A protein has these predicted regions:
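N-terminal Rossmann-like FAD-binding beta1-loop-alpha1 element of flavoenzymes
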Residues: 3-29
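Active-site substrate-recognition segment that forms the wall
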Residues: 16-24, 33, 44-52, 83-88, ...
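A conserved short coil-to-beta-strand element within the FAD-binding core of flavoproteins
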Residues: 173-187
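Helix-loop-beta segment of a Rossmann-like dinucleotide-binding subdomain
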Residues: 54-55, 83-94, 120-166, 266-270, ...
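Dinucleotide-binding Rossmann-like beta1-alpha1 core, especially the glycine-rich loop
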Residues: 46-135
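Short beta-strand to alpha-helix junction loop
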Residues: 61-67, 99-101, 147-163, 275-279, ...
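Short hydrophobic core segments
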Residues: 6-8, 196-208, 345
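C-terminal catalytic lobe of FAD-dependent flavoproteins
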Residues: 298-379
Length: 379
């Protein structure tokens, strides 16, 4: 078995890499150790949240461009497949409950006008006294008003992944239930004993990429990144699909289509049971119900836990592996991957085909490797 491009990992990043590769005519294979969308990408939240508009830099500009371009790409996937991705630019509400937060938010309003180019894009970051819909969020959560961010959006993670998969099925060979084991001289071995000759291999299997980097570059997995546990829940509640998502003190409340509301999430550096929910999620649910009384009595229909990849330098990790010119790492992203996966994937394909993509310096593998050396004192 052979291909131009082998993608390791069937999450949102891997699917977008495969889609861009197929669109460019590359013979592509995607392998996934479990099933496509079974990892962190197949969660519940689907929040597409911009960075703060102040202290503008290349990373924030990259994300802004990605969030701005995503609606058109989602529509294209939906038209091709006939599947709904559950995308909506719903905006975000952030209650202000400290004077210091209100002062900072006022400065961010001006920054958004400039950096989000409000006069042309229409995207705003404004302070208002009352929410667009009474009780969303609760009045006692916002004694100083709230910020309304109109750039933020939401997408249904599982519907999105299903549509992306459908969009590539006729052009990409998808192999599920087989994991990456090793790669040497352009031949990848899978856990089922398959040997795949690949001109280029993309490592995009989330946190499971970090042990592979340790295997190929030396050192342990933690030298390159680590998994961070997140827990979330899905509630049943008939609410207006247009309601903005609410973010307050680390808690998200996101209305999705079909009478569902996603709530989350935890961010756990230490954990014993990575895929089990516990009292930490109960705490998040309690906060969410107080924050948005409309879901106070909404029944929980699903509890979810998963592991997100946090690279050593926190930002996405992209680059050709040292001494392995045919292997490209494409992982990380942590909490922002869903909103930028399509743009990162395009850059990765550019890199794999001899191009020179414009990426923030902090995204490059070389930057992460320097960060890792600095943190371990091996300057």
């Amino acid at each position: 078995m052979s291909c131009d491009l082998l993608v390791v990992g069937g999450g949102v990043f891997g699917l977008w890499i495969a889609r861009h590769a197929a669109q460019r005519g590359l013979d592509t294979i995607l392998i996934e150790k479990d099933r496509v969308g079974s990892g962190a990408s197949g969660g519940l939240l689907g929040a597409l949240i911009p960075h703060l508009p102040e202290r503008w830099d290349a990373k924030k500009k990259f994300q802004f461009e990605a969030l701005s371009s995503l609606p058109g790409l989602v529509r294209a996937v939906e038209e091709e497949t006939g599947l709904d991705c559950g995308y909506r630019r719903c905006g975000r509400l952030m209650p202000l409950w400290k004077e210091s937060f209100a002062d900072i938010a006022a400065k961010q309003t001006a920054a958004a006008q400039q950096n989000w180019n409000t006069s042309e894009t229409g995207f705003t970051w404004e302070i208002v006294e009352r929410p667009p819909s009474e009780g969303w969020p609760a009045a006692d959560a916002m004694p100083l008003g709230l910020v309304v961010d109109t750039l933020a959006a939401r997408i249904d993670p599982r519907s999105y992944l299903a549509a992306l998969r459908r969009s590539i099925e006729s052009r990409v060979r998808i192999i599920e239930g087989e994991a990456f084991v090793a790669c040497a001289d352009g031949v990848v071995e899978t856990s089922a004993g398959k040997r795949i000759m690949a001109a280029r291999t993309m490592l995009s299997s989330g946190y499971e990429t970090f042990p592979i980097l340790g295997q190929m570059l030396g050192g342990d997995a933690a030298s390159y990144g680590r998994p961070v546990k997140g827990q979330a829940a899905l509630l049943e509640a008939e609410l207006d699909d247009d309601l903005p998502l609410v973010f307050h003190d680390g808690t998200y409340v996101i209305v999705h289509d079909g009478g569902r509301v996603a709530v989350g999430s935890t961010s756990e550096q230490r954990f014993d049971a990575p895929f089990s929910t516990d009292a930490a999620l109960d705490t998040v649910l309690d906060k969410a119900r107080r924050l948005c009384p409309a879901i106070a009595d909404a029944p929980v229909i699903e509890r979810w836990a998963g592991l997100r990849p946090r690279a050593i330098g926190r930002n996405p990790m992209i680059g050709v592996l040292p001494d392995h010119p045919d292997i490209v790492v494409a992982t990380g992203g942590f909490k922002i991957t869903f909103g930028i996966a399509h743009k990162m994937a395009e850059c990765v394909i550019d890199l794999a085909t001899g191009g020179a993509p414009e990426l923030p310096e902090s995204f490059w593998l070389s930057s992460h490797l320097k960060s890792g050396k600095s943190k371990t004192g091996n300057n």
